[in-house]
């Protein structure tokens, strides 16, 4: 799945004693040569994050941090709300439901006719890897990889990766052999940290239900969205899962059938 595109952050990054190891200048235990260096080498590992955490990151001496964790290359998972293509780049607005949508810019190779330059359509869930940037106090990502999700379990897996990576990176280096960090770390619930509560969609729906609801909301036709059209836009999703989500949304009053039992419209539509 995702790891076929590039090397992601994983537990295999850690040494046998449980400590985090990497090249000089990163998160490894300080050595005399590192301490003497005035210039820093930017962290090279990829850290899974949420948009809310990226927006709360602090920038000091050209280094982004979330709490005590230094970040540069990150991954996020979310749904594309808007996509706009220019001659040299594509700008996406990506929403993971933890904060307002974030701008993600992907530069395109004008001499490359392959599918790498194709625009991923709105209402598609994707995983993005890129570099965090800040311009005029507005944070954004410069993406070097954008991959549509093939399995919605990847969304859940990303959440677990976020929590795990932050726990390991924020673990005191002096306790590298002391075993796993406690899950009851009080810092985990502080603003900007990797609290599990940040990952719950505000409307209480699952990822699948949200994706179905968003597609129905986005349909401008008076009769609403046809179920066959819904299926064609969610080809990566099993049909029973789509039907189950539609039934749930109907029963909970989020959508309703219109001209027949196969056309649906959002109750929030004007």
UniProtKB/Swiss-Prot annotation:
Q: Which residues carry this modification: N-acetylmethionine?
A: 1
Q: Name one GO cellular component term.
A: chromosome, telomeric region
Q: Does the keyword Nucleus apply?
A: yes
Keyword annotations: Acetylation, DNA damage, DNA recombination, DNA repair, DNA replication, DNA-binding, Isopeptide bond, Nucleus, Phosphoprotein, Ubl conjugation
Task: Kindly list the cysteine pairs connected by disulfide bridges.
Answer: none
Q: Which residues carry this modification: Phosphothreonine?
A: 21
Could you cite one Gene Ontology molecular function of this protein? ubiquitin protein ligase binding
Residues the UniProt record assigns to the DNA-binding region sit at 74-148
- Name its GO BP terms in alphabetical order: base-excision repair; DNA replication; double-strand break repair via homologous recombination; mismatch repair; mitotic G1 DNA damage checkpoint signaling; nucleotide-excision repair; protein localization to chromosome; regulation of DNA damage checkpoint
The record's section on Pfam families has: RPA_C
Q: Cite the InterPro entries for this sequence.
A: NA-bd_OB-fold, RFA2-like, Rfa2/RPA32, RPA_C, WH-like_DNA-bd_sf, WH_DNA-bd_sf
In its record, the post-translational modification comment is: Differentially phosphorylated throughout the cell cycle, becoming phosphorylated at the G1-S transition and dephosphorylated in late mitosis. Mainly phosphorylated at Ser-23 and Ser-29, by cyclin A-CDK2 and cyclin B-CDK1, respectively during DNA replication and mitosis. Dephosphorylation may require the serine/threonine-protein phosphatase 4. Phosphorylation at Ser-23 and Ser-29 is a prerequisite for further phosphorylation. Becomes hyperphosphorylated on additional residues including Ser-4, Ser-8, Thr-21 and Ser-33 in response to DNA damage. DNA damage-induced 'Lys-63'-linked polyubiquitination by PRPF19 mediates ATRIP recruitment to the RPA complex at sites of DNA damage and activation of ATR. Ubiquitinated by RFWD3 at stalled replication forks in response to DNA damage: ubiquitination by RFWD3 does not lead to degradation by the proteasome and promotes removal of the RPA complex from stalled replication forks, promoting homologous recombination.
Phosphoserine occurs at: 4, 8, 23, 29, 33
Principal location listed in the UniProt entry: nucleus
User: Can you say where in the cell this protein is located?
Assistant: Nucleus; Nucleus, PML body
Q: Where is this region: Disordered?
A: 20-41, 171-192
Q: Where is this region: Interaction with RAD52, TIPIN, UNG and XPA?
A: 187-270
- Give the signal peptide range: none
For the cross-link Glycyl lysine isopeptide (Lys-Gly) (interchain with G-Cter in ubiquitin), what are the residue positions? 37-38
Q: Does the keyword Nucleus apply?
A: yes
- Annotated family: Belongs to the replication factor A protein 2 family.
The record's subunit annotation is: Component of the replication protein A complex (RPA/RP-A), a heterotrimeric complex composed of RPA1, RPA2 and RPA3. Interacts with PRPF19; the PRP19-CDC5L complex is recruited to the sites of DNA repair where it ubiquitinates the replication protein A complex (RPA). Interacts with SERTAD3. Interacts with TIPIN. Interacts with TIMELESS. Interacts with PPP4R2; the interaction is direct, DNA damage-dependent and mediates the recruitment of the PP4 catalytic subunit PPP4C. Interacts (hyperphosphorylated) with RAD51.
What this protein is reported to do is described as:
As part of the heterotrimeric replication protein A complex (RPA/RP-A), binds and stabilizes single-stranded DNA intermediates, that form during DNA replication or upon DNA stress. It prevents their reannealing and in parallel, recruits and activates different proteins and complexes involved in DNA metabolism. Thereby, it plays an essential role both in DNA replication and the cellular response to DNA damage. In the cellular response to DNA damage, the RPA complex controls DNA repair and DNA damage checkpoint activation.
PANTHER family, per the entry: REPLICATION PROTEIN A 32 KDA SUBUNIT, REPLICATION PROTEIN A-RELATED
**Protein's name according to its UniProt entry:** Replication protein A 32 kDa subunit
Source organism per UniProt: Mus musculus (Mouse)
Gene name tied to this protein: Rpa2
């Amino acid at each position: 799945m995702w790891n076929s595109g590039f090397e992601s952050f994983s537990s295999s990054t850690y040494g046998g004693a449980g400590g985090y190891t990497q090249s000089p200048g990163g998160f490894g235990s300080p050595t005399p040569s590192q301490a003497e260096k005035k210039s820093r080498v930017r962290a090279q590992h990829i850290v899974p994050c949420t948009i809310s955490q990226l927006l709360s990151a602090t920038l000091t001496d050209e280094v982004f941090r979330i709490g005590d964790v230094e970040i540069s290359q990150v991954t996020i998972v979310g749904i594309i709300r808007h996509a706009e293509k220019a001659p040299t780049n594509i700008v996406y607005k990506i929403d993971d439901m933890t904060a307002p949508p974030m701008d993600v810019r992907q530069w395109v190779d004008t001499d490359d006719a392959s599918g790498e330059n194709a625009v991923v359509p709105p209402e598609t869930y994707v995983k993005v890897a890129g570099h965090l940037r800040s311009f005029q106090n507005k944070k954004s990502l410069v993406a070097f990889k954008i991959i549509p999700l093939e399995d919605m379990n990847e969304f859940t897996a990303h959440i677990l990766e976020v929590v795990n990576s932050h726990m390991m990176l924020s673990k005191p280096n002096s306790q590298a052999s002391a075993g796993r960090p406690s899950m009851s770390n009080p810092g985990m619930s502080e603003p900007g940290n990797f609290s599990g509560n940040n990952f719950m969609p505000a409307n209480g729906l699952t990822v699948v239900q949200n994706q179905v609801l968003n597609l129905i909301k986005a349909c401008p036709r008076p009769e609403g969205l046809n179920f066959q059209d819904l299926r064609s836009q969610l080809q990566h999703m099993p049909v029973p899962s789509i039907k189950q989500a539609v039934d749930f949304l109907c029963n909970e009053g989020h959508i309703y059938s219109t001209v027949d039992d196969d056309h649906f419209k959002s109750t929030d539509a004007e």
